[in-house]
């Protein structure tokens, strides 16, 4: 709960330091005295936006500090631990501090550690809930009505799961859209690839085939020339009857043999010529073999030349060298396979998106069931409360409209608060039928009921009793006091019938010092509360009757 609030140089507050206790604390004062200024300052500790006008005129900076005492089961206690912001010497204490400079810059601290404004907002949701004087106007908005039903239902885990399931589905839906867009963009490419791959598959060029075809084509196209050249070579080597290398070498070896017998120095020459003769004879035999295998097949040559021509044509089409066409075929196949796999991935993603949507609908259905149950109870409880607030013939209803085909992060429900003000009338939406006073009373009843379901330790009601008076105001005070038995209640009010129900009372006064306006807030003793209430009852002049009435009001409550 909030135990201390210190304010320095904020607006018309020069210095303020108040201590707060359990139960119901009321803040009272004359109209225009600045009763809500402490609540406004407290809002800065919860991360609200700063303005330069917030700094007291003539001062360099304003500073607001709020001290909370936490119980170990409070989510704020665990949040501080997770964020490593706990005071190791006093882990159950949480001090929020905000400094605003005159130039508009600000600093935020939690337990003396610098933090961001968003971190202040995050922890604030576990510490305080402020019910403002404009809540009755918010009551006309369907989104706010849904929020109130959820607050009363007290199913935060279900709301978190709803948001998570919705986000999961939304992410998958976006992925599907992206995939489908890419698939559409790739369709033309896929069709072209399929045609190209089919064409190359049918052509079926083997690795190195083109080079082999070139060699074979050269051989076949030169067969006549090869035959002629081979015959000419054979003539010179051995087949010319007049003169040939074989016979000449043979005759030479005979002469050298005789020389070697006469002179051993010719032995080496003898060996060389014998080797040469063997080489010539082997070469002759090889040429004879090769020439006998020379093909002259015009049809085969035509087929090979046609295959080469087709290869060159395909290579030009794909803008590669003929010898690289096989590798190009592999690349195109790989790209086509990737696009086909991409289409399969899209189908898998669509199936995932479908399952996520079904899961989201299931969570939305569970959320609807919880809301329907709490909506019935809320309507009954609000009806009971507003009857106590001088709306004896009124009936309050909560209509829940569900469309599982239009699920959002908040579920599939649309809430409408309706009211039957008088007997014999049909219920109508609040915006069409409720007066300002009725809205204030309904709003207050709902705020008390929904706050009662909350685990937040401190509830602030900032002039929520606008538009009511007399006996109705007394009932409001009683409701707030009952609520303070379960949590700390801070109430800004101008009604004595509400103020008298407080366990503690603070009075706000506005005065002038050195031509500068200041506001101060003072904690009142029980004795001091009597004239303060009397002033609320009778204005600036406090009569004996007003004092007696004020004392009686306090006696009846306490």
Curated annotation (Swiss-Prot):
One of its GO terms (biological process) is double-strand break repair. InterPro entries: DNA_recomb/repair_RecN, P-loop_NTPase, Rad50/SbcC_AAA. One of its GO terms (molecular function) is ATP hydrolysis activity. CDD domains: ABC_RecN (cd03241). The keyword DNA repair applies. ATP binds at residues 29-36. Pfam families: AAA_23. The keyword DNA-binding does not apply. Coiled coil: none annotated. Keywords: ATP-binding, DNA damage, DNA repair, Nucleotide-binding. One of its GO terms (cellular component) is bacterial nucleoid. May be involved in recombinational repair of damaged DNA. Belongs to the RecN family. This is DNA repair protein RecN. The gene is recN.
């Amino acid at each position: 709960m909030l135990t201390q609030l210190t304010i320095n140089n904020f607006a018309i507050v020069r210095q303020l330091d108040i201590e707060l206790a359990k139960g119901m604390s009321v803040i009272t004062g004359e109209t225009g005295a600045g009763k809500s200024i402490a609540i406004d300052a407290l809002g800065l500790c919860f991360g609200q936006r700063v303005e330069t006008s917030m700094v007291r005129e003539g001062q360099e900076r304003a500073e607001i500090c709020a001290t909370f005492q936490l119980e170990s089961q409070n989510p704020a206690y665990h949040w501080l631990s997770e964020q490593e912001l706990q005071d190791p010497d006093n882990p159950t204490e949480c001090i929020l501090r905000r400094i605003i400079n005159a130039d508009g810059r600000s600093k935020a601290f939690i337990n003396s550690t610098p933090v961001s404004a968003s971190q202040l907002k995050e922890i604030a949701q576990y510490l305080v809930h402020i019910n403002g004087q404009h809540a009755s106007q918010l009551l006309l908005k369907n989104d706010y009505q849904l929020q109130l039903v959820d607050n009363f239902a007290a199913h935060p885990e279900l709301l978190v799961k709803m948001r998570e399931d919705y986000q999961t589905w939304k992410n998958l839906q976006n992925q599907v859209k992206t995939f489908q867009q890419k698939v559409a963009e790739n369709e033309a490419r896929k069709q072209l690839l399929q045609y190209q791959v089919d064409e190359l598959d049918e052509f079926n060029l083997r690795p190195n085939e083109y080079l082999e075809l070139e060699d074979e084509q050269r051989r076949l196209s030169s067969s006549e020339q090869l035959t002629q050249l081979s015959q000419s070579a054979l003539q010179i080597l051995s087949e010319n009857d007049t003169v040939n290398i074989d016979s000449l070498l043979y005759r030479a070896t005979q002469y050298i043999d005789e020389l070697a017998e006469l002179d051993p120095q010719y032995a080496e020459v003898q060996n060389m010529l014998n080797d040469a003769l063997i080489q010539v004879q082997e070469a002759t035999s090889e040429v004879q073999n090769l020439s006998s295998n020379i093909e002259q097949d015009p049809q085969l040559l035509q087929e090979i030349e046609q295959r080469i021509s087709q290869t060159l044509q395909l290579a030009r089409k794909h803008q590669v060298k003929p010898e690289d066409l096989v590798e190009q075929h592999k690349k195109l196949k790989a790209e086509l396979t990737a696009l086909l796999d991409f289409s399969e991935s899209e189908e898998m993603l669509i199936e995932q998106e479908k399952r996520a949507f079904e899961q989201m609908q299931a969570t939305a259905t569970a959320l609807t069931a919880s809301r329907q149950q709490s909506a019935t109870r809320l309507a009954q409880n609000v009806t009971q409360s507003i009857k106590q607030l001088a709306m004896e013939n009124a009936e309050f209803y909560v209509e829940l409209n569900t469309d599982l085909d239009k699920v959002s992060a908040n579920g599939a429900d649309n809430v409408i608060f309706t009211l039957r003000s008088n007997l014999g009338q049909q219920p109508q939406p609040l915006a069409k039928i409720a007066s300002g006073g009725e809205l204030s009373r309904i709003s207050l009843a709902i705020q008390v009921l929904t706050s009662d379901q909350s685990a937040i330790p401190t509830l602030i009601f900032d002039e929520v009793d606008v538009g009511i008076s007399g006996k109705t105001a007394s009932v409001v005070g009683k409701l707030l006091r009952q609520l303070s038995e379960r949590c700390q209640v801070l109430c800004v009010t101008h009604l004595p019938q509400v103020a008298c129900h407080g366990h503690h009372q603070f009075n706000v006064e506005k005065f002038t010092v050195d031509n500068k306006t200041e506001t101060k807030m003072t904690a009142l003793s029980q004795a001091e509360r009597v004239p303060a209430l009397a002033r609320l009852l009778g204005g600036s002049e406090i009569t004996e009757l007003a004092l007696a009435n004020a004392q009686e009001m306090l006696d009846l409550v306490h």
